[in-house]
């Protein structure tokens, strides 16, 4: 097992240039020295969950607000550009018990300092069954939700959800209820984990994803692959030409999709 690869040691981080979103200011609702997540993905840049939740605890609404306000004021005063405020960080942002209230506060601050900037949430979809969380996701500009495989065994192998009741069937059904506003992100990879082959790029996998996408009717699908080191060492990046071929096949089925590498 590798050590943690990337942790964000503050509540607000960046801005950084995101290959998917542009100039992005990050919001980390998890501990500054550990990871809390409802998945334990083989490819997570923050490492496996077993490496620890840290000691700092979750930031309060007041801390998030104060830190974000200070950063936005500084950027605005310096005439800097900002495309998006992105909830990501050290784990699953929707696990924060005050996620809906924090969303509303971030919207308020965005409107005050960078009204043209978007607000994005990168989520693994595990908390969309909570109506308060789903309603909060409906209030942001880019509600970006994960679906790495539409085949149950593959999803469990890659994403390793903590909740045994989290299934592909349930999440696809709930994603449909966003009625075309959700953006779906899918990580493409292959390799092996503890002697078991891992590959969500096969024809069977792509057909299952197409069926799921057509059912969900997302605003867009973001198709991407590994960009940093991963806790599972035996994973292989899917290169741009192959990503484009997969995206073309999905697009031909009537799905709006964009490959990133």
Regions found by a protein language model. Give the residues of each.
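N-terminal [4Fe-4S]-dependent radical SAM core
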Residues: 1-42, 47-59, 70, 74-80
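Auxiliary Fe-S-binding modules of radical SAM enzymes
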Residues: 2-20, 69, 190-261
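Short glycine-centered, acidic/aromatic-flanked micro-motifs in structured strand/loop junctions
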Residues: 29, 87-89, 186, 225
